[in-house]
Amino acid sequence: MNTWFLNVVDPLHQWFLGFGDIGVVLWTVLKILMIAIPLIVSVAFYVVWERKLIGWMHVRHGPMYVGMGLFQAFADVFKLLFKEVLYPSKAHKVIFVIAPLLTLAPSFAAWAVVPFDTKLVLSNANVGLLYLLAMTSLGVYGIILAGWASNSKYAFLGAMRSAAQVVSYEIAMGFALVGVMIAAGSLNLSQIVMAQAGSSGFFDWFLIPLFPLFIVYWVSGVAETNRSPFDVVEGESEIVAGHMVEYSGSVFALFFLAEYANMILVSFLISIFFLGGWLSPIQGWVSGQVSPLIDWVWNGGWPWLLLKVLFFASAYIWFRASFPRYRYDQIMRLGWKVFIPLTIVWIAVTALMVFSGVIQKGV
């Protein structure tokens, strides 16, 4: 399915390499833009999808104007860009502006090692898993600085909640990925996907043997992105908007962009680690070549990855529309007393499954 794309990209790559070192730099910048621009556009349409889907769940219409609601998010962005950025009188203005950038940067930098297909990846790093853990844990520093620089008790309280929540669930997420690493025998994300390939389709995915780790990673991902029902960081009924309470205009839009970019990132990572990434759920069930379209259905490709991502991204919206917010003590109890012990136990179970040959791909 990605052959046509590679046929276009490869000649373009060779053309850039003809310019020497400057060509390598330009090609790298182009690859970054090929990820960043679609990501920003995806966030805009994701916001529209969220408003539409929640509207349908609540028996409402959702956005209906500005291109039948399709371009409502773009209108909101333009509105925010032209709004004045207000600074609290006692705020630290430099850190106040830098904080949303520190939150946004890791959410974009993490995409450097995320593969979309066998050859569609910006950097096929062998330590991609460690890189992801580092990048996804950096965003909280921007939130903490935003709460401190705002000089507001509501913002500071939201920032402290975020710090405690990230510390609690980052451990569980890391332990869940240790199980994935043991099962795949690699820290390379492309190799983790290919470790789930086989002739049994979705039965070869890590979803089945690592199901408890899948649940832990999914729920922890929701908590890491501060989304409902774990949105105590910006609980409107308690602390107004948390660390974002003093923000307006374009700097507020940066926080908004970082949050939704992280949601899409977590949806990608769940699909890669547990659902075989771009692999087809019926891969290996049919042999032989029939047609390019039918061959793609059982051989897999990046559209399969996008379908899986759409499911998990929509699940975020379903959670928001369906579940009430947890109390802060309930969130802490779930992270420390349930998820961390469960992941530790299942790491040992995963090692036993690899040792006994139940999982064939681990080394």
From Swiss-Prot:
Enzyme nomenclature, EC number: 7.1.1.-
Q: Where in the cell is it found?
A: Cell inner membrane
Q: Which PROSITE patterns match?
A: COMPLEX1_ND1_2
The answer to whether the entry has keyword Protein biosynthesis is: no
GO molecular function term, any single one = NADH dehydrogenase activity
The similarity annotation says: Belongs to the complex I subunit 1 family.
How does this polypeptide assemble, per the annotation?
NDH-1 is composed of 14 different subunits. Subunits NuoA, H, J, K, L, M, N constitute the membrane sector of the complex.
Function according to Swiss-Prot or TrEMBL: NDH-1 shuttles electrons from NADH, via FMN and iron-sulfur (Fe-S) centers, to quinones in the respiratory chain. The immediate electron acceptor for the enzyme in this species is believed to be ubiquinone. Couples the redox reaction to proton translocation (for every two electrons transferred, four hydrogen ions are translocated across the cytoplasmic membrane), and thus conserves the redox energy in a proton gradient. This subunit may bind ubiquinone.
> What name does UniProt use for this protein?
NADH-quinone oxidoreductase subunit H
Q: What is the species listed in this Swiss-Prot or TrEMBL entry?
A: Xylella fastidiosa (strain M12)
Gene name, Swiss-Prot/TrEMBL: nuoH
